[in-house]
């Protein structure tokens, strides 16, 4: 190992580095970790830092401080990625640039069901389903789903609704669904529509239009004029959309445009996505720390993080020097990609749009930051705090007559909601409907861990409730030794009207703020988010608890019998109201099965 005060001998060190996946750590003076990185080939990746020329002054400055490089070979790239993430979180290296984005990129899902469902999707992929994306934003997904519904009329309903319908829904009436739920289209015809939709999502729009045009002519020759007209309408819809969204009509291209823009001390990297020639929109992102970060460093960090998790398109257009990007892409990507700077007119238009949107994002960020600071300062003055509360945690309780009680904790940092730190708690072991006991339990679970050294201590706690809830919360904080944390309750106003809330302090004081007070607006925003997060969790828990009352979970009831039952009685409520004798009259339902149905629904 090299002595701390000796110059680092990179050449000698590199001879010892294996060509294996792993994690490397650049160590500087006082054993301070300068940088943590992951590589699929440690030797090649670490060697790239010690070339004669560096990609940027920031990297050159880091390399000049290196006294040692520690490496940890791993069994796979996936293991290296996990280790790298853990080390970055625990060591907080100075030269790591992180793009923190609480929301994952959205996808379009085609489920693996007999009649596949078209759906918006975030999160982990389900086995058997097909996914198309990523899309830069929710709007792009929603618009694409709307287009696919209008053109190919695929179902979007969830399986419980699909399996229990006895008549077509409104979407069928407005020609947005072919109603496979009630057998108005057979499996083969529906599968053909699914194939066309999949090809369109894969960027093969021209093939889809050619296919539909051929179908139209074939139908016309058979004198099937209604079918021909339907194909004609599909072609017109697709052509109209493509005419509006194509930014280069010469070919169906898959391109990512990455623009790095610096305004003052703020750097923004914007990624715009073109799939099959359609411009899907863009997504500006900001590094977690911007001091001293140039456009090249920000772009390289974004490219490395983004394409570790997302598929590389056929073409990547950047506005920074190609050489360092090419070295990075060779390291992190297995498939070839054409790397370009804008030269053609269409490419310059794409990049200009991306750069302009990055500048607009910087302006919006500055405006939002100023607004958040103003609201936090108003809250500090209102609550008479020494400093503006950077981290605020808010709690709410949700249940239905004591059933399936769920507590929520949402987090706001510097005036912005931190979705990745939200938590839900299933409340058990209390008297149903006892909100005070529920609040006590969630706070004990949350702040018992904080008192033990796990988690982060907030600057302010908001409690959705009045004096009783605040009293319970105050007691818990005293029990765990955290009574010094500022806390306030938010009691609902008359008829729960916004703007009439009352602030309830632990000492019993109560205060009302003006309806236009910026501190009240911040409190309302955080409180409403806690309520939303609690009630969605409660509904999911309640639905799960009641799932046994649905027909599909009754032994002996398959899809055909379920459909016959719903058709005979007009829906689940009608089945529930039927007697055993009524149920026996349905074809295929024996008395034993009828009794099982009756017992399950009562």
From Swiss-Prot:
Record field: transmembrane: none
Family, similarity comment: Belongs to the UvrC family.
CDD domains to which the protein is assigned, alphabetical: GIY-YIG_UvrC_Cho
Statement: the UniProt record of this protein carries the keyword DNA damage: yes
Residues annotated as domain GIY-YIG: 19-97
Annotated InterPro entries: GIY-YIG_endonuc, GIY-YIG_endonuc_sf, GIY-YIG_UvrC_Cho, Hlx-hairpin-Hlx_DNA-bd_motif, RuvA_2-like, UVR_dom, UVR_dom_sf, UvrABC_protein_C
Source species of the chain: Aromatoleum aromaticum (strain DSM 19018 / LMG 30748 / EbN1)
Protein name from the UniProt record: UvrABC system protein C
Listed GO CC annotations: cytoplasm; excinuclease repair complex
PANTHER family reported for this sequence: UVRABC SYSTEM PROTEIN C, UVRC/OXIDOREDUCTASE
């Amino acid at each position: 190992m090299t002595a701390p005060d000796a110059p680092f001998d990179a050449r000698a060190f590199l001879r010892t580095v294996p060509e294996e996946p792993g994690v490397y750590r650049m160590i500087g003076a006082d054993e301070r970790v300068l940088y943590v990185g992951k590589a699929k080939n440690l030797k090649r990746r670490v060697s790239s830092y010690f070339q004669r020329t560096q990609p940027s002054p920031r990297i050159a400055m880091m390399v000049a401080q290196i006294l040692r490089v520690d490496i940890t070979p791993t069994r796979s790239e996936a293991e290296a990625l996990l280790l790298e993430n853990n080390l970055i979180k625990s060591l907080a290296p100075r030269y790591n640039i992180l793009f923190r984005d609480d929301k994952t990129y959205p996808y379009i899902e085609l489920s693996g069901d007999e009649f596949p469902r078209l759906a918006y999707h975030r999160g982990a992929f389900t086995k058997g389903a097909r996914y198309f994306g990523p899309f830069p934003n929710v709007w792009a997904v929603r618009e694409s789903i709307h287009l696919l519904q209008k053109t190919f009329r695929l179902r979007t309903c969830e399986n419980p609704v699909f399996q229990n319908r006895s008549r077509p829904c409104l979407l069928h009436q407005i020609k947005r669904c072919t109603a496979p739920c009630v057998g108005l289209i057979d499996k083969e015809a529906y599968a053909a529509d699914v194939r066309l939709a999949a090809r369109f999502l894969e960027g093969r729009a021209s093939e889809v239009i050619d296919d539909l045009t051929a179908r139209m002519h074939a139908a016309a020759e058979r004198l099937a004029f209604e079918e021909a007209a339907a194909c004609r309408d599909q072609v017109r819809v697709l052509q109209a959309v493509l005419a509006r969204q194509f930014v280069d009509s010469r070919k169906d291209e898959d391109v990512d445009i990455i623009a790095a823009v610096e305004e003052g001390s703020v750097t923004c990297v914007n990624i715009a996505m073109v799939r099959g020639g359609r411009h899907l929109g863009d997504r500006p992102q900001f590094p977690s720390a911007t001091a001293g970060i140039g456009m090249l460093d920000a772009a390289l960090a974004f490219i490395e993080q983004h394409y570790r998790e997302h598929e590389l398109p056929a073409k990547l257009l950047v506005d920074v020097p190609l050489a360092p990007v090419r070295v990075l892409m060779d390291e992190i990507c297995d498939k070839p990609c054409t790397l370009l700077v804008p030269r053609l007119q269409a490419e310059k238009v794409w990049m200009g749009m991306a750069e302009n949107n990055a500048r607009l994002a910087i302006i919006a960020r500055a405006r939002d930051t100023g607004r958040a600071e103003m609201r936090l300062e108003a809250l500090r003055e209102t609550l008479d705090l020494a400093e503006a509360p950077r981290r605020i945690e808010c709690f709410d309780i949700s249940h239905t007559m004591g059933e399936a009680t769920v507590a929520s904790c949402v987090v706001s940092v510097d005036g912005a909601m931190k979705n990745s730190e939200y938590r839900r708690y299933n409340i058990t072991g209390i008297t149903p409907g006892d909100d005070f006991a529920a609040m006590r339990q969630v706070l004990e679970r949350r702040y018992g861990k904080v008192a033990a050294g796990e988690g982060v201590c907030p600057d302010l706690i908001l409690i959705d409730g009045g004096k009783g809830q605040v009293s319970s919360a105050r007691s818990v904080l005293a029990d765990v030794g955290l009574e010094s944390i500022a806390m306030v309750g938010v009691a609902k106003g008359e008829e729960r009207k916004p703007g009439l809330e009352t602030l309830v302090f632990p000492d019993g004081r109560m205060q009302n703020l003006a309806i236009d007070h910026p501190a009240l607006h911040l409190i309302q925003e955080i409180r409403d988010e806690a309520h939303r997060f609690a009630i969605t969790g409660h509904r999911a828990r309640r639905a799960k608890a009641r799932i046994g009352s649905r027909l599909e979970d009754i032994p002996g009831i398959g899809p055909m019998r379920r459909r016959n039952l719903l058709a005979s009685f007009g829906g689940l409520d009608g089945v529930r109201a039927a007697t055993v004798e009524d149920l026996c009259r349905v074809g295929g339902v024996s008395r034993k099965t009828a009794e099982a149905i009756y017992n399950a629904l009562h």
